């Protein structure tokens, strides 16, 4: 433990035993980065510590969280899961798991960031032995930043192609079309077919121009992962444009990001309302909405329904990525993060439910026009965005207008999720750097390097075999399995190692009152049990990755996928094991020492109630003349 002395009510710690970004000085005597100006080091020494940014207005934080958490999954995944898993019945497990798992962890991550004033890694100074959770979240969000932007690139490509009198995916006869291309078909035309359970496309071996545009023009799909092929330069330019947009949204920090999200987070709602009004006026729209909500009570007995509800909650709430922690770290210390978390969770789930009406009104129209059951046109993920919906708009009057509106909404939904994800990664990265490494334009250069590295990796996804690479990232790197693992350990560490009551007191110190005891019980029991239960089910019933129900990935492709997943999941046990092995003393002494919190400089405003700084459990406001500097000792 560090040597401590007290002078005029201020604790000081010997410089050679201090480390990390929350205190100063570094090995060369230069100040380390912190959260506010302070006097540190030997008595009488003054070290300037750069202040941490805060949101200009609290609404900036709200809109940033809405922009990040409300994304493509709310629009293209939730409606399909609701339809597939019993319609309105799916809302029962969805709401239950949101109350038991989603909202408590959502609140936990935001409040942790606000209390510790640190990004995804240094926030775990609250229990340094489990700092591997921070490294794991950095790995996951890096993967997300890498592959998620591909959806933006495809959406931008479709948006550009929408500015024509005739949509290119509406007709055959293009260079990318095959002789099997057919523009319009109806199920009644197959009345004489011998296999009534097949569609016209399947019976006649015909292909829609929408599918051929997607596979032959946009993806230029090769035979498999082992055949990468050449770059698609049109999509590559769209990808580059998206990364440039992300860079200029993030490069100046949260003060500029907080302004941009006012547009990127709100305008998609305007488009959703416009699309809903248009959709409900189309023939067959009511049938689609009925199928979306029609309850099938037998589905409640299916474990898969509960698994789908759980994975959707954790994915759509953006839990385990560290970005919510980073956003919360820019709040004022006394911001009511409890109220914010409840509001944001309601907005997130409400958007998912509302988007279902938009999607299924269009799918109902599409099924009516083609004379097929809605199950034949209902899709999720990229299949909905780039096949089902583009096909539906070709059947509407003024098709280019509705296509442009949809893909512009898609671009905005993905853009704010993307640049807030990059913001979370950069925040965690810069928090690690001591002030001795500080230089002008540090943030701008760091963001540029991050965007460039991700862009180079993304080039593997704009080749002919790029879709297979994208699917690997999507299925393994930031899957429900990795997020559930992350959420489980977050709850265990805060509730059982740091202490649930202790953290409730810390939250009360920030917001002025203790949150509902339900939060404490969820962190301690219900949420970890739900997370581990769904995690085990996912692992036991894991199915090998298959693309489009036809292409089975080779064994080495599966191995790469599992490497993605394990690269984040192993951060927690490996870091824990490494710290315990390096520490000295008995195992009990090592555990006790390594689980003691490391307090940051922003706690200057608060006093430890007992004389041992390392034993801080409750913080209370004090006057300017009686502050305590709480710092870390060497691990």
Curated annotation (Swiss-Prot):
TM ranges: 61-81, 88-108, 139-159, 231-251, 270-290, 305-325, 342-362, 395-415, 445-465, 480-500, 521-541, 561-581
Residue spans of biased composition, Polar residues class: 1-11
Keywords linked to the UniProt accession: Cell membrane, Glycoprotein, Ion transport, Membrane, Phosphoprotein, Sodium, Sodium transport, Symport, Transmembrane, Transmembrane helix, Transport
Substrates-to-products reaction catalysed: creatine(out) + chloride(out) + 2 Na(+)(out) = creatine(in) + chloride(in) + 2 Na(+)(in)
Keyword Transport attached: yes
Compartments in which it is found: Cell membrane; Apical cell membrane
Role: Creatine:sodium symporter which mediates the uptake of creatine. Plays an important role in supplying creatine to the brain via the blood-brain barrier.
Family: Belongs to the sodium:neurotransmitter symporter (SNF) (TC 2.A.22) family. SLC6A8 subfamily.
The protein, known as: Sodium- and chloride-dependent creatine transporter 1
Source organism per UniProt: Bos taurus
Source taxonomy: Eukaryota, Metazoa, Chordata, Craniata, Vertebrata
Gene: SLC6A8
